[in-house]
Amino acid sequence: MWPPGSEDSYSAKMDYGKSVVNILPSVEMLVNFNGEMTRSSKRSCLLYAERVDFKELLQLRLTEKSDQRRMYITTVDSASFQDLKQDQSLNVSFSGFIDNVVRMLKDCQSGKLELHLTTRDQNLSSGREVHDYYLQFVEIRSFKNLVHLSLPCRSAPLNTVLFYINSMLEASHKKQYILEQSMQQMQAEINAQRAHAERLTTENTNIREALAENTRILEEKHAAEVHQYQEKLSKINEQRSNELERNRRAISGFQAQLDKASLEKAELKSAQEQAEKRCQTLSEELSCCKARVCTLKEQNDKLHGDVANIRKHERKLEYKIEDLKQHTVELQEHIQKGNKEKANIAAELEAEKKILHTKRQALEMASEEISKANQIIVKQSQELLNLKKTIAWRTEVALQQEKAVQAKESLLSLRENELREARITIEKLREEIPQQLQSMRNFAQGLEQKYSKQILILKERLAIPTGKENRR
């Protein structure tokens, strides 16, 4: 619990008793005190570990058992935790930090780790820090001690010590008040039990007196009854002796009959043993026969089952044979139809091959004609080049022939246009030939007519200009 009003308090309006949670029960353990001027010593201390539910706040409190005034407090909040995380390379969140602190405290309690309270070097401390000690979790090793965690710690001021001592006194007063109430209740119960015991003692005394009186009366009564019983017993003994003599005689007669019955019993027993042996033999034979009958019955049932399965299998095979026969007939019909279709397709294929061969021959002829037309076009182009050279030479000869030259040039331009159109047409025809091979069945005749007409037109167009030129 944090004392309100001190520097460790976080809100004066909060209910501290409900907010503070003990993360570890208060335990007693040995703590090493390492000072600058004194040697290290182990002292028995009480450790309290507390945290706040709704805020990241942890407090460890050490109190020397021999002197409760010596108290050392370690407080870790979110800001100081970030400093610890940066200085000591911690890799956990605040909740993980609390879990690890609890685990290390349990290790200290079991002896795996030790708690050291070390005095801080005043030369290295800054003016802002108010911590005088370091609370260290140390693992003792043969070569060098390993410090797992070092927390800043300070001596608790007097008001804090008084606050915690006051809290302890209040708790002890509450316990004392509860104990006093329980003692009063127990004292009342003891008084009631004492009164009950006295009442029982009085009743016991009365019962003992009544018991003694009843015992005396019963003894007198029993003495008279015993005298009567003794007289009756003497008479009974005489009668018994007479009956014993009579019984001895009867027993001797019964003994003779018993011996005779024993002989008869022995004979009957031997006969019974023989009968039992015979019965056992017969029972064994009967069990063997029953086992044999069961075996034969199982075999018979199995054979009946096999016969039924074989009959079912035969029926299935018959059904399958019928299905296979029907399927065979259907397959034969399909084969006949397939053979007919195959013959028809072969005839159609042969006819198509013949048509294709004819069309290929026609196409080859058209290709030859196109090549001839190309040769003619090449020759005409050479003639055009020669004419251009002649026209260029004639323009230099005389200005009088300008009109004739202009006419020649117009004719040449017309001829070039015609040649360009012819070349475009030929290129188109060359591109269309591979595509038209696939549709030769429908367009072969049209192609022949088209190519022949175009070749004739080209020949006429090429022949007309050459005739005019010769006339000039």
UniProtKB/Swiss-Prot annotation:
Keyword Cytoplasm attached: yes
PISA domain: residues covered: 53-105
Coiled-coil positions: 178-441
Keyword terms of this UniProt record: Cell cycle, Cell projection, Coiled coil, Cytoplasm, Cytoskeleton
Effect of disrupting the coding gene: Results in lack of centrioles and cilium formation, defects in coordination and reduced fertility. In neurons, RNAi-mediated knockdown after centriole assembly does not affect neuronal cilium basal body, cilia formation or movement coordination. In spermatocytes, RNAi-mediated knockdown before centriole biogenesis results in reduced centriole numbers and fertility. On the contrary RNAi-mediated knockdown after centriole biogenesis does not affect the number of centrioles, but affects maturation of a full-length cilium basal body and reduces fertility.
Role summary: Central scaffolding component of the centrioles ensuring their 9-fold symmetry. Required for centrosome biogenesis and duplication. In ciliated neurons, required for centriole assembly but not necessary for cilium basal body and cilia function. Required for sperm cilium basal body elongation together with Cep135 and Ana2.
UniProt subunit comment: Nine homodimers form a cartwheel structure with an internal diameter of 23 nM and radial spokes connecting to the microtubule triplets. Homodimer. Interacts with Gorab (via C-terminus); binds as a homodimer to a Gorab monomer.
Protein name: Spindle assembly abnormal protein 6 homolog
Upper classification of the organism: Eukaryota, Metazoa, Ecdysozoa, Arthropoda, Hexapoda
